[in-house]
Amino acid sequence: FISGSGSNLKSLIKNSRNYNFPIKINLIISNNTNAYGLKYAKKYNIPYKFYSYKSRNFFERNCLKELKKRKIKFLCLAGFMKVLSKYFIKNFRYKIINIHPSLLPKFKGLDTHRKVLENKEKYTGCTVHYVSSKLDSGNIILQKKILIRKNETVNTLKKRVLKQEHKLYSKAIISIFR
């Protein structure tokens, strides 16, 4: 599931091409018709679907129908900027993971890097966790901690954390399936 640039998706696609990677990406779903990540779906010939998020019920109903039709059993949220309902999550209990650009449980939600810098944290990082009905609150699978540099900006921090996300997401998937 994606909403934007798809850089974590691109990393997962590249890693999934390795014969040792434990999952195959069989479908990409987006709520944003302009999500740059959909270009990766086209480039790597991966089926994709776009469903408008005019209502969460409409979006989730269509997603569940498509996921069941394709017999997809595990979901990765990669920059998906919507909150899934309890009902949807219940259909995939401990089968949905997400990556978040902070060391959860700190700095849930949006604007993480700004909040981290405003709070004068010494460290930040990223977290892969199971999705639960509460925002960014599911059981933690893996985390990567990085030191915040002197004179760090939101943009430099965002780039550095994203680089770690690309590595951590695949490591987390491997740890789940091995």
Model-assigned labels for residue ranges:
Residues 1-36:
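N-terminal Rossmann-like dinucleotide-binding module
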Residues 3, 57, 163:
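Conserved phosphate-coordination/catalytic loops
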Residues 5-6, 30-33, 55, 80-82, ...:
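Short beta->alpha connector loops
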Residues 16, 38-43, 117-118:
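Active-site-proximal loop->helix
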Residues 22-24, 29-70:
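N-terminal glycine-/serine-/threonine-rich beta1-alpha1-beta2 phosphate-ribose binding loop
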